[in-house]
Each structure stands twice: as C-alpha cells, then as structure tokens.
C-alpha cells in the first residue's frame, strides 16, 4: 500500500477492513524521511490527530513499514542525501519530529519503538532516502526479502 500524501479516511478505512476482515498483512511502502514517518505512516497506523473520535474505524495498527530503513543505506550502499537548510519542507518536518517525539503518545508506546528509533535517527543524521533507492539493488540478491520491519 502506498499513499499520495497523508492517507484519507477512505484509504485508512479500506486498510482497516482488509486488516480486520481478510486477515492479510498490510505493508506500507514509503520514503525514509521525517514527513513520511510522522505524518503518512503514523496516520495510517493510528489515525488522524484531527479526528480522534473515530480513529479506531480509520486506522490499521498492524500495518508494517516496507521501505528504506536507516541500516539499509549502508548495508545496500543506497543513495541518500542530507537535508539542506534551504529545504523548508524537510526542515519543518524535522522540527515537528522533535516535537512529536516528546509530545505524541503514539511515539511513547513500546509497540512503536521501531518507528521512534527511525525518527530519532532522522533527527540526528539529518539525512533522507527515497524509496526509489531500493531499485538500485539487484532483485536477485538473496538478502532483499529479509527487509520487512517496524
């Protein structure tokens, strides 16, 4: 599953139905950046902070992240790049990441420890990597199927 930005109620409701009724695993494929982790992936897993009343109906808490992880950059020699000070959107996302790590209960829940560690790494390293970087890895490489986490 992927999203063009923060997933709508319809996308999240659909993911919830698949998770609950079909009992099949759901994976989210996204970039390794602060915005994706704290807004897109978090909203899919836990629902929208703006609509707390019905989040149980519009979230898929068992969704897994399938994408670039911090350790993948070195392990697979993936192309990543530094967040530049003039990239206003990325700088803003990093500032918000620092805030959500302190104040959002989602990131204090032990079930989301992996996501919290990723956000901490993003804040410390000030780097990002896009999902397309994975396409630089040879698909015949036997280590690629091991990548599912979070």
Features from the language model and the residues they span:
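Metal-dependent catalytic core segments for phosphate chemistry
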Residues: 1-6
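TOPRIM fold recognition
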Residues: 9-150
